[in-house]
Amino acid sequence: MPTANQLIRHGREEKRRTDRTEVLVFGLLVTRIIRFVHSVLFPIPVFCSIKVLLDYFCSLPIIDKLSKKWQLIWFYVLSVILCKSLFAVGYLWMDDLSRAISQFYPVVSGGLGGGNTPMPPTNPSEGGLLEGYYAHENEHSHDQQRGSPFWSKEYKESGSKRLFLNLEVEDQNTDTIGEQVKAESGKCEKIKAKIIAKTHELLVSEDTKFQIKTI
C-alpha cells in the first residue's frame, strides 16, 4: 500500500504535468493565431511598398505628363522587365559561381558545374553514330568506372575506332588549392603525352596499311 507521502508526491507530479500540458497547448494556439494574422496581414506592407514605388514612378519628369492609365501600363511593363533582368543576372551569377567552384572538386555528371561529361540523348536507340557508343557503354558498364585511369582497347563499331580515357579522381580534400592545381597540371601533361603517343601510333599504323595497299 502506498504511503501518504507517496500519494501527495504523486498528486503534485500529476498537477505539474497538467500545468505543463495546458501551457504547451496555450503556446501552440498562440503560435497558430500569430501565423494566421501574419498570413492575413502580409499583403498590406507589400501593397504599401508598391504604392510608394508607383507614386515615385509617377512623379518622374516624363511620366507625370501622361495619363493615369498610361502611367500604370508603363509601370507594369518596366516592373516585368526589371524582374526578368534581375532573375537572369542572378542565374548567370550563380552559374558562373558554381563553375568556378566546381573546378576544385571531382567532376560529377549532370551537375551545374563545369563538367564536360555530355548528357545522353533522349532516345539513343534511334540509330546513327551514337548507337554504337551507347551499346559499348552498356556492355562495359560493369568493369569500367570513371575513377580508374586506363586506356580502353581499340574496337571497331559502325566502321570507326573509339578510344576511351578514364581519369583518376583522387580524394584531395586535405590538400591545399595550390597542390591540387599542381596535381591537375601534372595529370594534364601525362594525358597530353599519352594522347600524342597514341595518335602517333595510329598514324604510323594507318600509314603502314596504306603503303601495303599501295604495293
Curated annotation (Swiss-Prot):
Subcellular location: Mitochondrion membrane
Keyword Mitochondrion in record: yes
Primary location recorded for the protein, binned into one broad class: mitochondrion
Membrane topology: Multi-pass membrane protein
GO cellular component: mitochondrial membrane
Residue ranges crossing the lipid bilayer per the database entry: 40-60, 72-92
Superkingdom of origin organism: Eukaryota
Keywords: Membrane, Mitochondrion, Transmembrane, Transmembrane helix
Any further remark recorded for this protein: A stretch of 270 kb of the mitochondrial genome is duplicated within the centromere of chromosome 2 resulting in the duplication of the gene. The expression of the duplicated genes (At2g07773) is not demonstrated.
Name of the protein described by the UniProt record: Uncharacterized mitochondrial protein AtMg00910
Organism the protein comes from: Arabidopsis thaliana (Mouse-ear cress)
